[in-house]
Amino acid sequence: MGQTVTTPPSLTLDHWSEVRTRAHNQGIEVRKKKWITLCEAEWVMMNVGWPREGTPPLDNTSQVEKRIFAPGPHGHPDQVPYITTWRSLATDPPSWVRPFLPPPKPPTPLPQPLSPQPSAPPTSSLYPVLPKTNPPKPPVLPPDPSSPLIDLLTEEPPPYPGGHGPPPSGLRTPAASPIASRLRERRENPAEESQALPLREGPNNRPQYWPFSASDLYNWKLHNPPFSQDPVALTNLIESILVTHQPTWDDCQQLLQALLTAEERQRVLLEARKQVPGEDGRPTQLPNVIDEAFPLTRPNWDFATPAGREHLRLYRQLLLAGLRGAARRPTNLAQVKQVVQGKEETPASFLERLKEAYRMYTPYDPEDPGQAASVILSFIYQSSPDIRNKLQRLEGLQGFTLSDLLKEAEKIYNKRETPEEREERLWQRQEERDKKRHKEMTKVLATVVTQNRNKDREE
């Protein structure tokens, strides 16, 4: 190999076509430049144990996943496809990845605490009591009576890969801890099992189904704004759920019912059905094709078959397209014009609010270069009066970009007087007036005194 050091990130670049194919099979897209940035910089700087070189243990991958899927503004929805693809490579490695996997394998002794379990019952009469802790299966999931597919959980919980030893030992209560609210992953055996997917490989290599829990839906609704208030944020959340959880048709309906209003659901479904592709790849208007690809009633799709999974993949893609289509609002520039800079608000904060208004009340993207002129005019004329007046007097204003105007506005803002400075200036001005008035009064008095003296002399 000479001086070349091969690391897992560099190895993925050497087999980039296979990495992209792996991502595409999961219905997601990844780009090489961002892949490099995340693997070698951003995930390292999260300080959760992601190494600059070498293969991260799966528990560290889970730590990165927690950061990415964190609710609200602390999450990174744009990184979901990349960590999902990395997780897939680590848990189901191709041949060119396996030589780099020995470091994660030492954690596999984690199932060893399970091995004393079968050998212990013959040695003590206390162990026959343990089976009584196995039958209580409610801890597998929080109660979720609304799911019509909950009866599928009567099968074994998702097995630990490799089908270790006696299956009953894998059913111990600690191993069946509740699914985490965002990833629904098991933390007891992170080195082998944490997939964060409801469709997992179960007994006899059959996919096993895990529905959303009530706590999942509650947390997603609680920690994210309504669709009517911020459609982009909620669309990003649902996209990350669709990518990582690979939900079934029933899951998708449950998700929409929990996160959207009835009117919003109707708009989303209508927009999604408009995007159903025909034989030529363009949106079709044939009702039978639309109903087959995006049915409004529960279809007979078996997620255990390749055909069923392909139907679900297309359905999820169309649902995401419907969310994006429903997020586009009719233009309401009057609402945009109501966003004006506050008296003490910084130009950067005002510009951020202005861009958010464009996203919320118009179908335009304020980051689009084609919309730069409109955003610039709004920024100038809706700034505070002192900043607006000085920006309007700039020479060559037509050649300024939005970044240039923001810098100029920051300069003007930073040169503003503080309340103390303004008070000092007004006090000095008043003092100068008083001095001037005093001098004038002195002159008048001096003139009067002089005139009186002259009269006295004449008399």
From Swiss-Prot:
<dbReference type="InterPro" id="IPR050462">
    <property type="entry name" value="Retroviral_Gag-Pol_poly"/>
</dbReference>
<feature type="region of interest" description="Disordered">
    <location>
        <begin position="97"/>
        <end position="207"/>
    </location>
</feature>
<keyword id="KW-0167">Capsid protein</keyword>
<keyword id="KW-0543">Viral nucleoprotein</keyword>
<keyword id="KW-1032">Host cell membrane</keyword>
<feature type="lipid moiety-binding region" description="N-myristoyl glycine; by host">
    <location>
        <position position="2"/>
    </location>
</feature>
<dbReference type="GO" id="GO:0020002">
    <property type="term" value="C:host cell plasma membrane"/>
</dbReference>
<dbReference type="InterPro" id="IPR003036">
    <property type="entry name" value="Gag_P30"/>
</dbReference>
<feature type="compositionally biased region" description="Pro residues">
    <location>
        <begin position="156"/>
        <end position="169"/>
    </location>
</feature>
<keyword id="KW-0449">Lipoprotein</keyword>
<feature type="compositionally biased region" description="Pro residues">
    <location>
        <begin position="133"/>
        <end position="146"/>
    </location>
</feature>
<dbReference type="GO" id="GO:0039702">
    <property type="term" value="P:viral budding via host ESCRT complex"/>
</dbReference>
<feature type="region of interest" description="Disordered">
    <location>
        <begin position="417"/>
        <end position="459"/>
    </location>
</feature>
<keyword id="KW-0945">Host-virus interaction</keyword>
<dbReference type="InterPro" id="IPR000840">
    <property type="entry name" value="G_retro_matrix"/>
</dbReference>
<dbReference type="InterPro" id="IPR008919">
    <property type="entry name" value="Retrov_capsid_N"/>
</dbReference>
<dbReference type="GO" id="GO:0003723">
    <property type="term" value="F:RNA binding"/>
</dbReference>
<keyword id="KW-1198">Viral budding</keyword>
<feature type="site" description="Cleavage; by viral protease">
    <location>
        <begin position="127"/>
        <end position="128"/>
    </location>
</feature>
<feature type="site" description="Cleavage; by viral protease">
    <location>
        <begin position="445"/>
        <end position="446"/>
    </location>
</feature>
<keyword id="KW-0472">Membrane</keyword>
<dbReference type="Pfam" id="PF01140">
    <property type="entry name" value="Gag_MA"/>
</dbReference>
<dbReference type="InterPro" id="IPR010999">
    <property type="entry name" value="Retrovr_matrix"/>
</dbReference>
<keyword id="KW-0694">RNA-binding</keyword>
<feature type="short sequence motif" description="LYPX(n)L motif">
    <location>
        <begin position="126"/>
        <end position="130"/>
    </location>
</feature>
<keyword id="KW-0946">Virion</keyword>
<keyword id="KW-0468">Viral matrix protein</keyword>
<dbReference type="InterPro" id="IPR036946">
    <property type="entry name" value="G_retro_matrix_sf"/>
</dbReference>
<dbReference type="Pfam" id="PF02093">
    <property type="entry name" value="Gag_p30"/>
</dbReference>
<protein>
    <recommendedName>
        <fullName>Gag polyprotein</fullName>
    </recommendedName>
</protein>
<feature type="compositionally biased region" description="Basic and acidic residues">
    <location>
        <begin position="417"/>
        <end position="434"/>
    </location>
</feature>
<keyword id="KW-1188">Viral release from host cell</keyword>
<dbReference type="InterPro" id="IPR002079">
    <property type="entry name" value="Gag_p12"/>
</dbReference>
<feature type="compositionally biased region" description="Low complexity">
    <location>
        <begin position="122"/>
        <end position="132"/>
    </location>
</feature>
<keyword id="KW-1043">Host membrane</keyword>
<dbReference type="GO" id="GO:0019013">
    <property type="term" value="C:viral nucleocapsid"/>
</dbReference>
<feature type="site" description="Cleavage; by viral protease">
    <location>
        <begin position="197"/>
        <end position="198"/>
    </location>
</feature>
<feature type="short sequence motif" description="PPXY motif">
    <location>
        <begin position="157"/>
        <end position="160"/>
    </location>
</feature>
<keyword id="KW-1187">Viral budding via the host ESCRT complexes</keyword>
<dbReference type="GO" id="GO:0039660">
    <property type="term" value="F:structural constituent of virion"/>
</dbReference>
<dbReference type="GO" id="GO:0016020">
    <property type="term" value="C:membrane"/>
</dbReference>
<dbReference type="Pfam" id="PF01141">
    <property type="entry name" value="Gag_p12"/>
</dbReference>
